[in-house]
Amino acid sequence: ALSNGSQFGTYLKTTNNLKFEPVKDYFVNAKVNFQSAYPSFNYLLNTSVYNNYNYYFQNAQNQTISEIGGSVGLKWFKTELFANYFRIDNYTYFDAIAMPQQSGSPVNISQIGGDATFSYGKFHLNTRLHFQNVLTNKDLLPLPSFIGRANFFFQSKAFKNAAEIQTGI
């Protein structure tokens, strides 16, 4: 998608995915994505009657995000292992005094993780582990190093198979 705008610059986004099954029940996914967009409107203009947060961010550059990654999926336990790398140029952020800034050097992020679903009848447990590291400019984008998530849910057909319900925690 490409959009040319007079007020907020250009917008460009490409999403490229490749999926194949080299061996039965094993799936390989690869992706290369790119996005170049003007910073969010929240960074450009904000006024406040409560605090001195009145600013107008001039000469902002497009923030560009490049992503490369992939995953391997296994039918066994509905498992997926993934790895991603992000490079963010002109990263836009608010500094210590709440003024918008853009980074002069890129922010680089690496991620690895996995996802699995275990099922017993109509009961399911989905777990996800996600490790990530901000490789450069950690002070601009503080992210947790580890994210873990688990969902336990019940899933069944209802109303003579006319609907499906899912509930859980």
Please identify what each model-predicted range represents:
Residues A1-I169:
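Exposed, low-structure sequence patches enriched in small/polar residues
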